[in-house]
């Protein structure tokens, strides 16, 4: 928004642009929303709103995310709206705190660890950071990761991604759509499988297949039992991957792209033994995983290409200089 300034930095009658910002002290997670036209204006409001004693000035403003010192008005104007700042008094130092994934809470002796930063809380934050670095990674995430982001509190996810709650709500809606699309594909495949099974029963193909499987099983028991046991120990897939392959319908839709790649590289015979499947079923699932992986990679490459084209059209004449970093507390 724009208002006419009557005091401070701008002269009388001069139009100034106010940037909405979020401020907090180093000892509190309570933050305040302010609007400032420049850094000096933001420092002044920080002293007033956060009750910083004048004897502790000058106040240093750093980005709450990584401790970058913001002391240049041009850089300040380039920051997005609702950027989070930490106001440091003259006797305070910023310190990176890994427990909250770089949200940059300042270290204090009386700091209480947030319970949501442990266990599942850390896991969804790690996934959120991956999404923050590259939005197209949505395509590569597993259903479990997608569901964690959908279930994450909107305000916490907005803070982690440095976006507004409205933007994050739209993102969570998109993530839910991705989950719904995968479920629709899974149900379609299930219906197709049921249809094929009905055809097999109708044509007496199923009984012949069972006889063939029984004969094959007896031969394996008589000849290759020792080899099969030895082969099963060679499977390097994690337990959650094997569980998904055994229990999920269309398991390729449940796994992340990294897991899909591991499945496609696994030896079919060893995987068949580990899953207690026949070779044909194992190879069919591996082929489905390979197709799903290729589709996701193709979609990701397409997004990257579109992003590169958009960036080249809207690239600024020059890059910002590397900002300085606040020195970290050695403790």
UniProtKB/Swiss-Prot annotation:
Q: Which Pfam families match?
A: CIDE-N, DFF-C
What subunit structure does UniProt give? Heterodimer of DFFA and DFFB.
* Cellular location(s): Cytoplasm
Protein species of origin: Homo sapiens
Q: Which SMART domains does the record cross-reference, listed alphabetically?
A: CAD
Q: Per the record, where is site Cleavage? A: 117-118, 224-225
What does the record list as GO biological process?
Answer: apoptotic DNA fragmentation; chaperone-mediated protein folding; negative regulation of apoptotic DNA fragmentation; negative regulation of deoxyribonuclease activity; negative regulation of execution phase of apoptosis; positive regulation of apoptotic process; thymocyte apoptotic process
List the residue ranges of the region (Disordered).
305-331
Molecular-function annotations in GO: deoxyribonuclease inhibitor activity; protein domain specific binding; protein folding chaperone
Please give the InterPro entries that the UniProt record associates with this protein: CIDE-N_dom, DFF-C, DFF45, DNA_fragmentation_mid_dom
Protein name, as recorded: DNA fragmentation factor subunit alpha
Modified sites of kind Phosphothreonine: 243
Posttranslational modification: Caspase-3 cleaves DFF45 at 2 sites to generate an active factor.
Domain (CIDE-N) spans: 17-96
Q: Which residues carry this modification: N-acetylmethionine?
A: 1
- Gene3D superfamilies per the UniProt record, alphabetical: 3.10.20.10, C-terminal domain of DFF45/ICAD (DFF-C domain) (1.10.1490.10)
Report the superkingdom from the record: Eukaryota
Question: Keywords for this entry?
Answer: Acetylation, Apoptosis, Cytoplasm, Phosphoprotein
Q: What is the role of this chain? A: Inhibitor of the caspase-activated DNase (DFF40).
Q: What is the lineage of its organism?
A: Eukaryota, Metazoa, Chordata, Craniata, Vertebrata
């Amino acid at each position: 928004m724009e208002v006419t300034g009557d005091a401070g930095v701008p002269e009388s009658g001069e139009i100034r642009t106010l940037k909405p910002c979020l401020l907090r002290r180093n000892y509190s997670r309570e933050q305040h929303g302010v609007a400032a036209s420049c850094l000096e204006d933001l420092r002044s409001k920080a002293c007033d709103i956060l009750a910083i004693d004048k004897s502790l000035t000058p106040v240093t403003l750093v980005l709450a995310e990584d401790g970058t010192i913001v002391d240049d008005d041009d850089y300040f104007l380039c920051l997005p709206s609702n950027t989070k700042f930490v106001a440091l008094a003259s006797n305070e130092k910023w310190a990176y705190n890994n427990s909250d994934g770089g949200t940059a809470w300042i270290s204090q002796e009386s700091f209480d660890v947030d319970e949501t930063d442990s266990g599942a809380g850390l896991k969804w934050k790690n996934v959120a950071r991956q999404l923050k670095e590259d939005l197209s990674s949505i395509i590569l995430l597993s259903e479990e990761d997608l569901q964690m982001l959908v279930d994450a509190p909107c305000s916490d996810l907005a803070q982690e991604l440095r976006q507004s709650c409205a933007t994050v709500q739209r993102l969570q809606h998109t993530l839910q759509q991705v989950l719904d699309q995968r479920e629709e594909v899974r149900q379609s495949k299930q219906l197709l499988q049921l249809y094929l099974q009905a055809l097999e029963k109708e044509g007496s193909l199923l009984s012949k297949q069972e006889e063939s499987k029984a004969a094959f099983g007896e031969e394996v028991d008589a000849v290759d039992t020792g080899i099969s046991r030895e082969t099963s120990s060679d499977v390097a897939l994690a337990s959650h991957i094997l569980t998904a392959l055994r229990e999920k319908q269309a398991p390729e839709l449940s796994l992340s792209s990294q897991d899909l790649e591991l499945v496609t590289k696994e030896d079919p015979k060893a995987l068949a033994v580990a899953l207690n499947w026949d070779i044909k079923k194992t190879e069919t699932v591996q082929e489905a995983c390979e197709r799903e992986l290729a589709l996701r990679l193709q979609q990701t490459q397409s997004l990257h290409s579109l992003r590169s084209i958009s960036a080249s059209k809207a690239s600024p004449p020059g890059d910002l200089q590397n900002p300085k970093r606040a020195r970290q507390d050695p403790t």
